[in-house]
Each structure stands twice: as C-alpha cells, then as structure tokens.
Amino acid sequence: MAVPARHTSSAKKNRRRTHYKLTAPTVTFDETTGDYRHSHRVSLKGYYKGRKVRDDTK
C-alpha cells in the first residue's frame, strides 16, 4: 500500500484548500414574468429572452 514519504503540513494543506469555494448562483430578474430565474435558462412560465418558448397547456 502506498504511504506518503513526507507529512503534509497544515499550512500546505490549507493552501491547497483555499480553492475549495462555494459560488453563489447567478440569479437575474425576469422583466417579462416578474420572477427570478437562473441566467441562460427558460423561466418557470416558459419565457426566454422575452419570448414564449414553451407551452404549459396540457
């Protein structure tokens, strides 16, 4: 079984972990529906870039 040749110090470990971050989701206000939605996604009411692209009638 492989074993590390040197002990990883806490400073080295913490420097490596500085890049493990959570990013906030990009949420924009949709002028057409008045709701918030993710960027580059169809809104829940079926609008994208101000146009109706999905019909919800079933």
Curated annotation (Swiss-Prot):
Entry keyword annotation includes Ribonucleoprotein: yes
Lineage: superkingdom: Bacteria
InterPro entries: Ribosomal_bL32, Ribosomal_bL32_bact, Ribosomal_zn-bd
GO function terms (MF aspect): structural constituent of ribosome
GO terms under biological process: translation
Annotated stretches, region: Disordered: 1-23
Gene Ontology CC, one term: large ribosomal subunit
Transmembrane segments: none
Record key words, sorted: Ribonucleoprotein, Ribosomal protein
Stretches with biased composition (Basic residues): 9-20
Family to which this protein belongs: Belongs to the bacterial ribosomal protein bL32 family.
HAMAP family the record matches: Ribosomal_bL32
Protein name from the UniProt record: Large ribosomal subunit protein bL32
Lineage of source species: Bacteria, Bacillati, Bacillota, Bacilli, Lactobacillales
